[in-house]
UniProtKB/Swiss-Prot annotation:
Free-text comment on this protein's domains from its UniProt entry: The C-terminal domain mediates copper(1+) binding and is involved in the copper(1+)-dependent-ATOX1 interaction. The C-terminal domain appears to act to limit transport through the pore by regulating the rate of exit of copper ions at the intracellular side. The N-terminal domain can collect copper(2+) from copper(2+) carriers in blood. The N-terminal domain, in the trimeric arrangement, tunes its reactivity with copper, promoting copper(2+) reduction and copper(1+) stabilization thanks to the presence of histidine (His) and methionine (Met) motifs.
Descriptive protein name: High affinity copper uptake protein 1
Keyword Phosphoprotein annotated: yes
Keywords: Cell membrane, Copper, Copper transport, Disulfide bond, Endosome, Glycoprotein, Ion transport, Membrane, Oxidation, Phosphoprotein, Transmembrane, Transmembrane helix, Transport
Any one Gene Ontology cellular component term annotated for this protein: early endosome membrane
Modified residues (Cysteine sulfenic acid (-SOH)): C189
A Pfam entry, by short name: Ctr
Listed transmembrane segments: 62-82, 133-153, 157-177
GO molecular function list: copper ion binding; copper ion transmembrane transporter activity; silver ion transmembrane transporter activity; xenobiotic transmembrane transporter activity
Catalysed reaction, written as an equation: Ag(+)(out) = Ag(+)(in); Cu(+)(out) = Cu(+)(in)
Length: 190
C-alpha cells in the first residue's frame, strides 16, 4: 500500500506493535510537497525536560544551550507575570472609566389623581470614547499574550511549562491581592 501522501509520517497497521522510541521530540522529517522541499518538526506529545533544539513560538527562535533555556525561562516567567498584571490593570481601568449611573426621579400625574414617580437612567459612555478604545487595545494585547503562553505551554517542555505556571502564580500573588472582584471578566485561557 502506497503511503507517500502521508508527508513523511509513519503509520502502523493493526498487526504491528509500537516500540519505545528514544528520539528527541523535535526530530525533523523531510518531505516533498509539489516539487519543493520543506521540513516538518514533530511535536512532542509528552512532557520532557531538555534544552536541545527546542523551538519557541517561531521557527527561527530555537533553544540549543542551557543558557538559552535559562534566558527563555526568565522571559516566559516575566511574560506570564505581565499577563496577570495586565488583567488587573484592565479591571482597574474599567472600574475607573465606568460612568456612574444617575437616577433622576420626578413626580408625574397618574390616573385617578394619583402621583407616580418616573425614573430616568442617564448613562454617558460612548463606543468611540478614549477609555473604550484603550480597553480595546489592551484586550487585543491580552488575547495575544494569552495565546503565546498557551503555545509555549504546548511545547511540552517542562522548563517552559514551569515558567508559565510560576510566572502566572507570581503575577497573581503580586497584582491580585487588592482584587475585590469575585468573577474575573477578563479571563481568557485558564
Amino acid at each position: 500500500m502506497d503511503h507517500s501522501h502521508h508527508m513523511g509520517m509513519s503509520y502502523m497497521d493493526s498487526n504491528s506493535t509500537m516500540q519505545p522510541s528514544h528520539h528527541h521530540p523535535t526530530t525533523s522529517a523531510s518531505h516533498s510537497r509539489g516539487g519543493g522541499d520543506s521540513s516538518m518538526m514533530m511535536m512532542p506529545m509528552t512532557f520532557y525536560f531538555g534544552f536541545k533544539n527546542v523551538e519557541l513560538l517561531f521557527s527561527g527562535l530555537v533553544i540549543n544551550t542551557a543558557g538559552e533555556m535559562a534566558g527563555a525561562f526568565v522571559a516566559v516567567f516575566l511574560l506570564a507575570m505581565f499577563y496577570e498584571g495586565l488583567k488587573i490593570a484592565r479591571e482597574s481601568l474599567l472600574r475607573k472609566s465606568q460612568v456612574s449611573i444617575r437616577y433622576n426621579s420626578m413626580p408625574v400625574p397618574g390616573p385617578n389623581g394619583t402621583i407616580l414617580m418616573e425614573t430616568h437612567k442617564t448613562v454617558g459612555q460612548q463606543m468611540l470614547s478614549f477609555p473604550h478604545l484603550l480597553q480595546t487595545v489592551l484586550h487585543i494585547i491580552q488575547v495575544v499574550i494569552s495565546y503565546f503562553l498557551m503555545l509555549i505551554f504546548m511545547t511540552y517542555n517542562g522548563y517552559l511549562c514551569i515558567a508559565v505556571a510560576a510566572g502566572a502564580g507570581t503575577g497573581y500573588f503580586l497584582f491580585s491581592w487588592k482584587k475585590a472582584v469575585v468573577v474575573d471578566i477578563t479571563e481568557h485561557c485558564h
